[in-house]
Amino acid sequence: MDPLGSFMTQITRFVPIFAILFGLGTFGLNAAISQEGAAKGAGSIEDKSPFETLPGMQPSGNMLLPNGWTINAQGRQAPLGDFPVHLLVHPDGNNLIVLHCGYGEHEIITLDAKTLNKIARVPVPQSFYGLALSNDGAWIVASGGEDERVYAFPYNKGYLGEPVVHTLATKTDKFVVSGVGLSKDDTEFYACGLLGNQVKRGKRPFGAMEKPGVSPTETLQLPDDSYPYTVLEDAANQRLFVSLWGRSAIGVVDLKTFQLVATWKTQSHPTEMIYLDDTNRLLVACSDENSVVALDATTGELQEVLLTALYPAAKNGSTPSAICVSADRRVLVAVNSCNNNIALFDISEPKKSRSLGYIPVGWYPTNVKFTVSGDQIIVTNGKGLSSKDNRYGPNPLKPAPKNVTEYIGGLLQGSLSAIPTPTPEELATMTRLAFQGAPLRKDSVVVDAERSPNNPVPAKVGDPSPIKHCIYIIKENRTYDQLFGDVAKGNGDPGLCIFGENVTPNHHALVNQFVLLDNFYVDGEVSADGHEWTMAAYATDFVEKTWPLTYGKSRGKLTYPAEGATKIGQPSSGYLWGKCKEAGKSYFSFGEFIANGRNPGDPSRAKIEVLEGHFDPNYRSYDLDYSDLDRAASFIKRLKQFEEAGELPNFITMHLPNDHTAGTRVGKLTPTAMVAQNDAALGLVIEAITKSKFWPEVAVFVIQDD
């Protein structure tokens, strides 16, 4: 066999959602779990409509995720910890080293490369992506994240000793160590400051500090919003490459002066880099653009763009966030984090690279490396191999100590895939599996299976429809069973229903009169990625990599990354409002992606540019001390103004958040009271819409963010 030779448990439903098409009659608007992924073939759901298929283990042995993707990870699988983000292969070929930076324990895990058995687990107080090995393999250097540290661990056959600690900033500084690196002779170390927009260079990386305090370093200041991700040294030319995650560029640093001498344009969100000195190319993963770019390493000129998505015309969202090359530098591998596969390319001839195929791996792959011998491809999967329910979570009837597995942030533990480097024939088979496991369509047309003749939803863009206005209501955090487990016609669990019809009569009246979607799921785990998926059908790698820290081990430096809070968190493909603008449709937001004024009554402001002039400044966004009934009143007041003007925006978003509840906090409304309040507010909103002049041409969709 000549690898690549010829060409070189049950799922918890996260969301109660119903759709109402007002004035258009009642019909079954089914929620499709899968589209193309339901086609016949290996890794698919045979002979069943996707509308009838539940996520979880399928007869084929594959795992259907709630988002419609099928996990059919190739090779051997091994469990890891919480959100593995960076992988190294020890130069002796015997061990694998994995850094974890999730909601739970931050740690370095070492594994035997042959058996995949764990050798050691070493906790790190906090980290963020950065991991490097000394040239002799005797030291591991790791990021300390918001603790502003770089750790240097002595390493011996899979075991780590007590680290040498370099403190790079004070506790109040906002440097935040991300990527780290070592000089070729191991006498210096480099550290990126994600929030400080800086790179620091220090000496004696493995030597203990002579006195306590901040270590002496040289500091390079980068432009604002650079968000330096990692570094790569070109020792022969005395240069340091820095991937500027937030500026779509590579910074080139002169190591003699430690000054920025050039900035080379890339595509959006450059992350990992590989320098090929034999062909003078710099390869850069661009995670927000479905691409890996090849730059001339002398001039920075763009030589070619390698598209990693399954389909050439696919919209952004594949998330190629990490890359590696084979020892002979002929094959490039890129992880497609959001496609649950890796893409392989023949890069043997500059400017003439070509796709070789795809290999299915686990859920949200984050890093990839070839083994030293080249006989295996190793992949870390950030979210493991399946979705899970929190069966060990809180139960009001059975008090128990808090457990990290009770919360979604720590529920999806990572995994490792070890794939024998395939032959061309094996890769062709794996490529077919990758396509069969994807809920994508080559032409992106609407699935028209089981459509009734009077379906008002257009089969394709441009077809006529009586729907002229869509109102999209986003609520917070409730599961299907919590609200609708008591609905007999739905596939729910009454034992999990805590806000049933006695608490939510309006929700129940709506799903009984109109449409109940009991097999519909959201892609977000928490509000941070949830609102991004809700409004963009995508959460960037910046959001995915930072929210676990902000929700878990944050020291208060990294902040909420989503809903327009950061420019880098916004996908380059934009949000639904931007798509409306491109299509010449009017749009308006009540509270979604809106920043509140300091006090109720103070005007709010738009968080993103596209919403400027397209929102109600008197509608208060997320604030659990503010009543949803007041939000409903604010909407109704504006609706009357729309009626007086005779025009209703084509697309309206509304944040109705108080079903989030304040838990059992002292002095707050009880969860039951808050959900009941939210139910009453929704009823008032729907009543106002149905009594308005726009009613015959309106469709309303209600969804949970996560």
Kindly give the residue locations of the regions a language model identified:
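N-terminal pro-sequences and low-complexity stem/linker regions of secreted or lumenal proteins
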Residues: 429-706
